[in-house]
A protein has these predicted regions:
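A mobile, often basic/glycine-rich helix-loop segment
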Residues: 150-200, 242-251
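Generic recognition of stable, solvent-exposed alpha-helical segments in well-folded globular domains
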Residues: 3, 19-22, 55, 59, ...
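Conserved protein kinase catalytic core
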Residues: 91, 124, 160-161, 237
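A residue-level signal for conserved active-site and pocket-lining positions in enzyme catalytic cores
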Residues: 27, 151, 279
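A short SAM/SAH-binding and catalytic strip from SAM-dependent methyltransferases
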Residues: 147-169, 205-209, 217-228
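Rossmann-like AdoMet
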Residues: 1-145, 298-301, 322-349
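Long, Lys/Arg- and hydrophobic-enriched amphipathic alpha-helices
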Residues: 194-349
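Active-site flanking residues adjacent to catalytic metal/cofactor-binding acidic residues
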Residues: 84, 117, 151-154, 230
Length: 349
């Protein structure tokens, strides 16, 4: 058992079972022992636990830079434009976007104030060292305010802790984490989540994460804004399809899917498909206008129309093909844009 596993075990032995969302939060975000708090251990790379669009190469950042530039131009090229990136991992996307913006338009680059939101102190220190003042690393956006800007969130929503439920005897039960003979084990209790009730016996699924508390601070911070969420996920109809009997929760360790979420707490990634319907509902309640989601292949192709005409190198074309390939990132990932305030959305289509 891991050090974090021992801490969680001691907690449930003393205080009783905890929700899976609570367990997942500890596994990923414990300030010293959580998966994302591990210093010096690569999680995103060919040698880590998973790859992302960012680790494919700099083209992903270039394409997003083109999208931001179009939005900036459509809204009068303001002298100050704030970009907020939550959960920036090692800062590579930030640097790729800033370099691409510099090449696109020095005027746009001088207007950009780039903020990286990272609540984990160990991550903030490493980000500050890597970014070297090119972006400001903040612990919370609560005290910040910007007239106009954008949020870029790549593979963030899938790492928000989710509760787990299963159907038994026509009722929903919440799956809990408890102790059994010195090890972590499953428990359950009756529950009444806001989930469909016409699903089969034994059906297991995730409930939505706590989206409101995550999305409200950046919505308050950016008065007029374009928010771009890129992630793997489904709408509610597909997510809670009767045939999807085992849910979407997955564990990753060194590019392999692991079978058991209770194994190696803090040492493996835990993730679940994003419920885009739930995201849209919260966004609407926060005053956003929702724009139709599209798969990453279509989205990046629209973003990169001008870039594709600029004679990119064979290496860049190879990266682009990986990013839009239907069996890789292109078909599995979706981009959801939303705008708030008095802005021109600078429609891609």
């Amino acid at each position: 058992i891991t050090d974090l596993g021992r801490l969680i075990l001691a907690r449930v032995e003393e205080f009783g079972p905890i929700s899976f969302a609570d367990y997942m939060a500890q596994c990923l975000y414990h300030p010293e022992l959580g998966y994302y708090a591990r210093p010096g251990k690569p999680t995103v790379s060919k040698n880590g636990d998973f790859i992302t669009s960012v680790s494919v190469g700099s083209v992903f950042g270039k394409l997003l830079a083109h999208r931001l530039y179009k939005f900036w131009c459509a809204n009068g090229s303001p002298k100050t434009f704030t970009i907020l990136e939550p959960g920036a991992h090692d800062g590579s996307l930030c640097l790729d976007i800033l370099e691409a913006i510099s090449n696109l338009s020095p005027e746009f680059r001088s207007a950009v104030d780039y903020l990286v939101h990272e609540p984990l102190s160990v991550r903030r220190k490493s980000l500050q060292a890597k970014l070297q003042g090119k972006a400001c690393v903040i612990a919370t956006p609560d005290d910040c305010h910007a007239k106009i800007g954008a949020l870029i969130a790549n593979e963030i929503l899938d790492a928000l802790p989710v509760p787990l439920y299963f159907r038994s005897n026509g009722q929903w039960h919440e799956i809990l984490v408890t102790s059994n003979a010195g090890s972590l084990d499953w428990d359950s209790r009756p529950a009444k989540p806001d989930l469909p009730t016409n699903l089969p016996e034994g059906y297991v699924t995730e409930g939505p994460p706590e989206l409101s508390s995550f999305m409200t601070p950046p919505a308050r911070m950016l008065e007029n804004a374009l928010f771009i969420w890129i992630d793997y996920g489904l709408d509610e109809e597909a997510l809670y399809h009767p045939a999807r009997t085992a849910g979407t929760l997955r564990c990753y360790f060194k590019h392999k899917t692991c079978a058991h979420p209770l194994e190696n707490p803090g040492e493996q990634d835990l993730t679940a498909d994003v419920n885009f319907t739930a995201v849209e509902k919260i966004a609407s309640s926060l005053g956003f206008q929702i724009h139709p989601a599209m798969n990453q292949s279509r989205y990046l192709t629209y973003c990169g129309k001008e870039w594709l005409l600029s004679n990119p190198s064979p290496k860049e074309i190879s990266q682009f093909q990986t990013l839009i390939h239907p069996t890789q990132f292109g078909g599995r990932f979706y981009a959801l844009e939303m705008t708030k305030g008095n802005v021109d959305p600078a429609s891609l289509i």
